[in-house]
Amino acid sequence: MLTCSRLEPSARARHGHTAKGKYYLVLATNIWYHYIGELMEFNGVIIEDTYAEGFPVWAARVIITAVTKEWAYKAATEATGFATSTIGCPCEAGIEKFIPASETPDNRPGYSILICCGKKALKEQVLERVSECVLTAPTTAVFNGHAGEEEIIPIKLHFFGDKFEKKVEVGGIQCWSIPIMGGDFIVEEEIGAIKGVAGGNFLILGDSQMSALIAAEAAVDAIAEVDGVITPFPGGVVSSGSKVGSLNYKFMGASTNEKFCPSIREAVIEKGLETEIPEGVKAVYEIVIDGVSEEAVKAAMKAGVQAACRVPGVVKITAGNYGGNLGPFKFNLKDCI
């Protein structure tokens, strides 16, 4: 049960903000939030009244199974490598979730991965990642992870069998069995693709590198419990946020985002440039989220933001956007609390 009470004047003074309307304190499972004018706080962490800007992508979900959970994970990890951002990678990809043997077509443990990019590039990426990273991994099999897909990606791996391949049925699914050195590779050759959403994000500002990092890890762990999303960067965390272009090097398409670099806060101010680093902030980490739908990304952002705010030392949560020029999806931080 939620209980609400008006904040006392001393509480307002403690937070250093003038009155712009009603002040409320809401208590719920030891987590509290309140609104101060346009400022929001959750569990004592400032939540900036801004939004992340998402854009449409095509997403393929591939289920990878193996004789053990460990081998399925190794194959899934390989298949999602070099896929953090389409700024410099051919796609964005990550492990979505573990799937127990009772829920896979061949009754073996597995993982689902999401591969996200443009429609044309997606066909190439699914084929290349399955053929080079999963086919080559011991005991693996591949199945389509999308039901009711909008597009079909034919990966045609059976030709690798050089006419020694054969059609088989696995769990009621038509597949190919390709003979390989380690036995037989089972693959469902038609992988579905749907219209997904990329670009969900939020930034965690901490009073130390470790507080920000622990909060980022907590956020990623919480997001991992949400179906239909991935956090494509290493460990789900972005350490080197970038801006479009460069202030000093014309040949650079992207460069460090000095607004969010704590170590040069004073230098940025001295140059007359803007900084987004409040006093006392020592580190910033960003969480980027891609998903199969707008709803999935919203749920992931909410789970991640709230988890991050539960970590001591987190000062502020904000998000990155391009003023509506990047994409049609708006993920407001106020909806995360």
Q: Residue ranges of each PLM-predicted region?
A:
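Glycine-rich phosphate/pyrophosphate-binding loop regions near the starts of catalytic domains
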Residues: 102-111
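Conserved mixed alpha/beta catalytic, RNA-binding, or beta-rich assembly cores of soluble enzyme
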Residues: 40-49, 53-98, 113, 117-120, ...
